[in-house]
Amino acid sequence: MTDSNNQSPNKKTSGSSGAPTAADGRQENRRSRGEKRGGRRDRRGQERDSEWQERVVQIRRVSKTVKGGKKMSFRAIVVVGNEKGQVGVGVGKAGDVIGAVRKGVADGKKHLVRVPLTRNSSIPTLSNGRDGAASVLIRPAAPGTGVIAGGSIRTVLELAGIKNVLAKRLGSKTPLNNARAAMVALSELRTHKATAKERGISLEQIYS
């Protein structure tokens, strides 16, 4: 007689079947929904990043004197803009060029300036900016004129979306000072409507 208490090793206990349960299905649904949401966020982030353009104005090798001697690094001046009225200038330092440029881009996006543009992709009024020993004068121009500027000033104006403008550099020729002076000039621009409101007059009086 065989012992009825002995069970065959091939027998599976109840509840250990390989069939998926309702809880497993719910977990898979949650996971798929999370992946979809994450995918949409990634696409939105990529679209935002694709709007911005980056141009390196200058890369220099700099040194810092420390206790053990001189520490060499790279400094990158980067202009960031979307050609739709937003532009920024950033500076980044790192031990390699790629790291310096990456930091410069991040710094530029932290110091963005909104530029009021006219229908002709120009600026509404004349403006002057100064940084250190550099001074920049920018004035509106007629359609078809183009960007009459040079160096880092031209880069700032182009990435801001300005297509018709005249610019004159005075004083220092340093790329960083000129770029920052151009940023100061752009930050002081106001639309005709805002100017009329500040002065307490009508738009007709502004144009007259």
UniProtKB/Swiss-Prot annotation:
InterPro entries: Ribosomal_Su5_D2-typ_SF (IPR020568), Ribosomal_uS5 (IPR000851), Ribosomal_uS5_bac-type (IPR005712), Ribosomal_uS5_C (IPR005324), Ribosomal_uS5_N (IPR013810), Ribosomal_uS5_N_CS (IPR018192), Ribsml_uS5_D2-typ_fold_subgr (IPR014721). It holds the Pfam family Ribosomal_S5. Part of the 30S ribosomal subunit. Contacts proteins S4 and S8. GO terms for biological process: translation. Residues 25-37, 44-54 have a biased composition (Basic and acidic residues). Belongs to the universal ribosomal protein uS5 family. GO terms for molecular function: rRNA binding; structural constituent of ribosome. PANTHER family: MITOCHONDRIAL RIBOSOMAL PROTEIN S5. The N-terminal domain interacts with the head of the 30S subunit; the C-terminal domain interacts with the body and contacts protein S4. The interaction surface between S4 and S5 is involved in control of translational fidelity. Keywords: Ribonucleoprotein, Ribosomal protein, RNA-binding, rRNA-binding. This is Small ribosomal subunit protein uS5. GO terms for cellular component: small ribosomal subunit. Residues 1-54 are annotated as: Disordered. Residues 52-115 form the S5 DRBM domain.
